[in-house]
């Protein structure tokens, strides 16, 4: 399926490309539809994508599961697949991404809201979560990604610049934790994926849930802390990462696990 088939189903919307087809997936923003139809987002990806985060059928399942449990996520408008492709259409959710340049007086409130969201996700029941991201599954996928050349070795964190896939795997094996503190994790809990009300700094939406699943809580807090600390969003920094961890619950944080899960993310 190409996007023309889906475009014919939404002929009154203007289609705006959001990305450039990372891992074969395309995301479009649909605006200008007939009132009172909301703004929409459409994702189109291979039916069997190389990157599991672009399994759109699985993402739709995760969105519907989160909605049933009271987490603010995009409403699924349409989902489907044919022989070659899958698609997912969702309503846009209101709010401003936590990654945006918030006024200085609101920034600590933004990271505290992210921490509260992490706690809310981690309190959801693991028994009926629709996906498994335990280490056995995640490490197996990491090995496949190395074997298939899917790890971007030019985009590693500074301390691992120049490493090979085999070096990454060796370090992953060496530092793998013996036990997992299992909760429901978002899987990519970065500031870009959390939307907040610009007035109250309360969470209004959670997006890009393709990696949601049962995993150690550090799979979330490690990525959130890293993204708040590094200088890609220079209005944040180490003090904001520390505030996030404090608000989440510093007594729950294992620094060795933080490092391990930041390493694990290099494979995805």
Swiss-Prot record:
Keywords associated with the record: Antibiotic resistance, ATP-binding, Kinase, Nucleotide-binding, Transferase
EC number(s) stated in the UniProt entry for this protein: 2.7.1.95
GO BP, sorted A to Z: response to antibiotic
Taxonomy, superkingdom: Bacteria
Keyword Transcription: no
Catalytic activity: kanamycin A + ATP = kanamycin 3'-phosphate + ADP + H(+)
One Pfam family, short name: APH
Matching InterPro entries: AGP_Transferase (IPR051678), Aminoglycoside_PTrfase (IPR002575), Kan/Strep_kinase (IPR024165), Kinase-like_dom_sf (IPR011009)
Keyword ATP-binding: yes
Catalytic residues, chain numbering: 188 (proton acceptor)
GO terms, molecular function: ATP binding; kanamycin kinase activity
Family per similarity comment: Belongs to the aminoglycoside phosphotransferase family.
Function: Resistance to kanamycin and structurally-related aminoglycosides, including amikacin.
Name of the protein: Aminoglycoside 3'-phosphotransferase
Protein species of origin: Streptomyces fradiae
């Amino acid at each position: 399926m190409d996007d023309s088939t889906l475009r014919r189903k939404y002929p009154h919307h203007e289609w705006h490309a959001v990305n450039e087809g990372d891992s074969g997936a395309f995301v479009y923003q649909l605006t200008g539809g007939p009132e009172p139809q909301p703004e929409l987002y459409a994702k189109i990806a291979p039916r069997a994508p190389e990157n599991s985060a672009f399994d759109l059928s699985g993402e739709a399942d995760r969105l519907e599961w989160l909605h049933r449990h009271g987490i603010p996520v995009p409403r699924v408008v349409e989902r489907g697949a044919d022989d070659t492709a899958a698609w997912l259409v969702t309503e846009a959710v209101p709010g401003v991404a936590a990654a945006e340049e918030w006024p200085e007086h609101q920034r600590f409130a933004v990271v505290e809201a992210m921490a509260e969201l992490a706690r809310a996700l981690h309190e959801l029941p693991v028994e009926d979560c629709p996906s498994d991201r335990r280490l056995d599954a995640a490490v197996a996928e990491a090995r496949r990604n190395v074997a298939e050349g899917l790890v971007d070795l030019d985009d590693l964190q500074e301390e691992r610049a120049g490493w090979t896939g085999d070096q990454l795997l060796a370090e992953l094996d060496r530092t793998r934790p013996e036990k997992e503190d299992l909760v429901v994790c978002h899987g990519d809990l970065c500031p870009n994926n959390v939307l907040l009300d610009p007035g109250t700094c309360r969470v209004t939406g959670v997006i890009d849930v393709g990696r949601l699943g049962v995993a150690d809580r550090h799979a979330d807090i490690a990525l959130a802390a890293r993204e708040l600390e590094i200088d890609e969003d220079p209005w944040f920094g180490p003090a904001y990462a520390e505030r996030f961890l404090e608000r989440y619950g510093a007594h729950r944080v294992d620094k060795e696990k933080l490092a391990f899960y930041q390493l694990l993310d290099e494979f995805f």
